[in-house]
Amino acid sequence: MDPRKNLASVGTMPEQERQVTAKEASRKILSKLALPGRPWEQSMKQSFAFDNVGYEGGLDSTSSSPAATDVVNILGMTCHSCVKSIEDRISSLKGIVNIKVSLEQGSATVRYVPSVMNLQQICLQIEDMGFEASAAEGKAASWPSRSSPAQEAVVKLRVEGMTCQSCVSSIEGKIRKLQGVVRIKVSLSNQEAVITYQPYLIQPEDLRDHICDMGFEAAIKNRTAPLRLGPIDVNKLESTNLKKETVSPVQISNHFETLGHQGSYLATLPLRIDGMHCKSCVLNIEGNIGQLPGVQNIHVSLENKTAQIQYDPSCVTPMFLQTAIEALPPGHFKVSLPDGVEENEPQSGSSQRHQEQGPGRTAVLTISGITCASSVQPIEDMLSQRKGVQQTSISLAEGTGAVLYDPSIVSLDELRTAVEDMGFEVSVNSETFTINPVRNFKSGNSVPQTMGDIAGSVQKMAPDTRGLPTHQGPGHSSETPSSPGATASQKCFVQIKGMTCASCVSNIERSLQRHAGILSVLVALMSGKAEVKYDPEIIQSPRIAQLIQDLGFEASVMEDNTVSEGDIELIITGMTCASCVHNIESKLTRTNGITYASVALATSKAHVKFDPEIVGPRDIIKIIEEIGFHASLAQRNPNAHHLDHKTEIKQWKKSFLCSLVFGIPVMGLMVYMLIPSSTPQETMVLDHNIIPGLSVLNLIFFILCTFVQFLGGWYFYVQAYKSLRHRSANMDVLIVLATTIAYAYSLVILVVAVAEKAEKSPVTFFDTPPMLFVFIALGRWLEHVAKSKTSEALAKLMSLQATEATVVTLGEDNLILREEQVPMELVQRGDVIKVVPGGKFPVDGKVLEGNTMADESLITGEAMPVTKKPGSIVIAGSINAHGSVLLKATHVGNDTTLAQIVKLVEEAQMSKAPIQQLADRFSGYFVPFIIIISTLTLVVWIVIGFVDFGVVQKYFPSPSKHISQTEVIIRFAFQTSITVLCIACPCSLGLATPTAVMVGTGVAAQNGVLIKGGKPLEMAHKIKTVMFDKTGTITHGVPRVMRFLLLADVATLPLRKVLAVVGTAEASSEHPLGVAVTKYCKEELGTETLGYSTDFQAVPGCGISCKVSNVEGILARSDLTAHPVGVGNPPTGEGAGPQTFSVLIGNREWMRRNGLTISSDISDAMTDHEMKGQTAILVAIDGVLCGMIAIADAVKPEAALAIYTLKSMGVDVALITGDNRKTARAIATQVGINKVFAEVLPSHKVAKVQELQNEGKKVAMVGDGVNDSPALAQADVGIAIGTGTDVAIEAADVVLIRNDLLDVVASIHLSKRTVRRIRVNLVLALIYNMVGIPIAAGVFMPIGIVLQPWMGSAAMAASSVSVVLSSLQLKCYRKPDLERYEAQAHGRMKPLSASQVSVHIGMDDRRRDSPRATAWDQVSYVSQVSLSSLTSDRLSRHGGAAEDGGDKWSLLLSDRDEEQCI
């Protein structure tokens, strides 16, 4: 019976019957709504209409049905926030009485009503939140027990298309969540899946279809006999099969409408809405209007162009709802109210409509002249206060600023002029681009409560409606419908999270292309975007995002204008007048795909913006040349937008050298003055007057100081002037103020003394400016040298990009008709490019023809090359190792993977907050304080002088008799004031930090640690989390042979002959595994020469084959003694004559292709090595499978000790790698790391670092590869291995020269010592100022303590010397040696078990369970046989421990056996 009929008749029933009927209907509907997967489940957390009509809102069955209590095991909880999220989510479900989650026990106790909710549904709800949930042992779910064999069946499916462990995880994760699936085991090596299922809930065909929908090829291999169900089972099946029960949204809408009319609190409003075009409009209206206060329910029908809204009239009015819908972007919705609704009805909410906020633009500005934090804040304050500016961020370290602004309100030129008016030099660093944030309706953000908030914040989610024709070159217009009924294709962009490798990309593309209405799919791995062209009459963009979500990824439709458009600048020759300009501009703007064209006759340049999907740079050049002009690409310096600091380095170097040349004699004279004379009456030679009032010393001081003041100090004056222009006082202002007043005062009193013909030359302060300028200029010079290093990392990254590409024109059967060398800037999407062996892939693309191996270490960090075949994705900047290939360009310019990595590094360097020197932060308060004290001293002594002249006369040094009393008072007060200003000069404060940093970095370099400046040295002691890369960091990064096994029952050759044959065969291979095997064989044989190989063939992804001869001579020259291995098989004699061996070396597939059978014991032995993180390959000689080689990347011997030491220091340690989870777990167990992030991209590493930083932690990243460089730049301290890539070294803050991981510990230890010394220096400087300033001000004159001017200079010099001597004490630092670390770890350092290591995939924080021996695993491996037939004859220099050592230090470079070749 239709529940709506029951509900519609409520009003005609007696009160008691009506109440019972409503309860019955509510129980039925809400029990169906509680099923997982219903789109309206989350919106029904309360009873809504039932409460409002006076009925009981809860389920009546809750009180009558008995409640059950069960325990659910939950994996993946990390904090109490997880606990609260689970409790809030589950407690809101219907049928849940209560839930208590325990973080310590990793479980939840749930009390629920079985008739409404079962345990499996609860587990699924928890898993949907990102956790792993399962019923505790001994607890039965509310459906038939899984443990009953009679209710389970097993099916084996053949699954093709899996390439890595990520594919296995995706299949297992998706299928395991299906109702009726008990367990699943997917084998990558066997390309099959074994699934135990409940046949009354799901069938094998359904399982096969689900796997096919994920983008794989699946077929049923075999299945168990179908179950025969009795009458009881049939009844149970009917009651359990929840899939047959559905509730349509229309039923729910009608249901609420009926209830709404019955109650006095809710009303139902039918509306007519015009302007809706697609499902995105429906989601836009429902998602925003449904969250307004007073709106209980809303249902929008795209087909009928109507909406049914259930609302509270006391909170909201129909006119308010009409205004709210019409205010939603894009603003073209037209709402008609039903007849009878008063249009002038008062509104309870604001109906003022605000215009949609325009798209923001971001500009990056280069700002010269920023010297400290006090310069940064005024710029940010000034910009943020300007109308139209939404956000600003200034980087002191880079000298750049990012501004997000609305171009409709303020222009970029106005912003640049405003900053220049503050005294800085500004230039535009990069082109502006449009930003339109996508509104995420699933987020927990608060909903706007006013119409202005809605209009300003809600963003349109409709797909791009532009036509997307096939690229046909210039001048071709997009296809338009020829009839009114025709519809052009549309394009949408989907943001995808969770992709970890090229296999994920292939799966998404393959799966989407299976669905009707999808015309083409293009997925970018690094940027996490998918470009989909589709038929809007068949499918809509939200449905496309849902299809991707069904594959196990997070997906959301992006805004149309988030897609970057092409931008090119051309040099055009041949223009003579404005008519030429008009012809070019009009021709370009008429061309389909060109959105903007501007030609300047004076500069002969053209600026063109275009849609790269329709037209390309070469097409634009061709258009211009066709109308009679010549066009070429304007040369752009790729590093022009980076601040290289060359100008600043040059000017501060000049300032320092000038100050030093004239400052050294001044310092020498100061030392001379401090030397006491032999007799008190004797006058020093330099004190003799040349003329009355002018001594030799003062004349020399004047000459030297004048040069320093106006040459060496010129740039200080410039910086101080700019600082004062924007009303801030920094260290430059204080330095200039002190030196200028000291110089001016000294000059004035010297001139006065000469004019008065004084008998004695006065004491001057000419020695102050040279000393200050020398030290400060040196610090500024070194500072800018360090800053210049930041741009070198980006330059190194850009050097990885190819400069030219070979674009080919293809004929029939892919026959190359023409080849052309094209600059990278002119490569277009869709171009076919040829790449020869050893060349770089110039762009991201797909292989059209050819097979090869590609070195993609710049992305994955792994040295193992990856097989590329037709259809495979290649990455710009990677190396083509073997054969020539043709590829189709899919991402060019700024969309390539390499460009994305460059962008990541740029953003990391821009966003990193530099740690300012304590003196700089202090100077903002210190400068005005000292000026006030100095002024106050002047005023006070003038007053004291006029009140009691005797005080001044007593302490003023030998005033001339010709000077009046007033002049004496003024001179004395001014001298005291100058003494305060000079003695308080920030020389000691300024030297406190840089001297300690200079000594600390020098000591670090002597100990094998290169620290780039003071910021990382200061920051290192605050580090709370260290993230290690794997390959090349924790491990050596080079594969090594760990074990060599011979089969005793088939081997007929002695071990050394097998080694000679295998080594000779592999000598012709370029694969890293082949190089490792050859090196091992040479070491074991003790020779550098091998035999000869012919007919060599290497098959990418499989192995090699060849014929080997002339190995007897090698064995004869070898010092090794032959040891036959075969049981009962005599060794081959050395004098038997030359032999030729047919050799096969490779993986399982290679052996199968060559007709060799792999027995189960050999396969199990290979699997055992692979589970330990090693790569196992097989050896066949003369058609007989005779051996197996295990190869791995060994862990560095000090890695485990370094990890233990860091942990003992209270530092958290994590492993983050692009390698697979199996390998990552194997490494983590060996070195003692509990938390692992595997299969991550460079962007994932940056995001993980940012995530930890957002939690308030200081993070250090240790890596060695190009893929690590963005994370190294983002981390608070980036630490690079000295043997790593140049890019990583340039991006890092610290470089470990000796490639020793214990130096990570040493750098933190030295940082603590250095910071401690800096603090001591600052304390000494502050004590000096706190004591010296009162003395200089004359506070202690009444008790006889007087500071003469020369004493002030001497005290200032003494304070500087004391700070320098304090810093030099760091020279005594000694790095803790290895023996000390080993003694501390003795007996405490133990490897972890697999269950102690939590592995997370990509950016997914859900923990992947460690492998445990479950009952299912035991059943799966019950057929394993003994490996007694395998014996190890590896002759190792490590003696008997070789086998154990191989297991202990083994590591798999890649577990994708099918992609490894020798």
From Swiss-Prot:
Chain ranges passing through the membrane: 656-677, 700-719, 727-747, 767-787, 922-944, 975-996, 1320-1337, 1349-1368
Enzymatic reactions: Cu(+)(in) + ATP + H2O = Cu(+)(out) + ADP + phosphate + H(+)
Binding site for Cu(+) 3: C278, C281
Domain HMA stretches: 68-134, 153-219, 267-333, 361-427, 490-556, 566-632
Lipid bilayer topology: Multi-pass membrane protein
Subcellular location, principal: Golgi
Phosphoserine modified-residue sites: S478, S483, S1395, S1454
Residues engaged in binding Cu(+) 4: C372
Annotated residues for binding of Cu(+) 1: C79, C82
GO CC annotation, single: trans-Golgi network
Cytoplasmic membrane side: 1-655, 720-726, 788-921, 997-1319, 1369-1462
Chain sites annotated for binding Cu(+) 6: C577, C580
Pfam families: E1-E2_ATPase, HMA, Hydrolase
Annotated EC: 7.2.2.8
Keyword Transmembrane helix: yes
Skewed-composition ranges (Polar residues): 475-487
Keyword Metal-binding attached: yes
GO molecular function annotations of the record: ATP binding; ATP hydrolysis activity; copper ion binding; P-type divalent copper transporter activity; P-type monovalent copper transporter activity
Subunit description: Monomer. Interacts with COMMD1/MURR1. Interacts with DCTN4, in a copper-dependent manner. Interacts with ATOX1. Interacts (via C-terminus) with ZBTB16/PLZF.
Disease: Defects in Atp7b are the cause of the toxic milk mouse mutant (tx) phenotype, characterized by accumulation of copper in the liver in a manner similar to that observed in patients with Wilson disease.
NCBIfam families, per the entry: ATPase-IB_hvy, ATPase_P-type, copper ion binding protein
Assigned protein family: Belongs to the cation transport ATPase (P-type) (TC 3.A.3) family. Type IB subfamily.
Free-text note on domains in this protein's UniProt record: Each HMA domain can bind a copper ion, they are tightly packed and closely interact with each other. Wild-type ATP7B can usually be loaded with an average 5.5 copper atoms per molecule.
UniProt protein name: Copper-transporting ATPase 2
Organism per entry: Mus musculus
Gene that encodes it: Atp7b
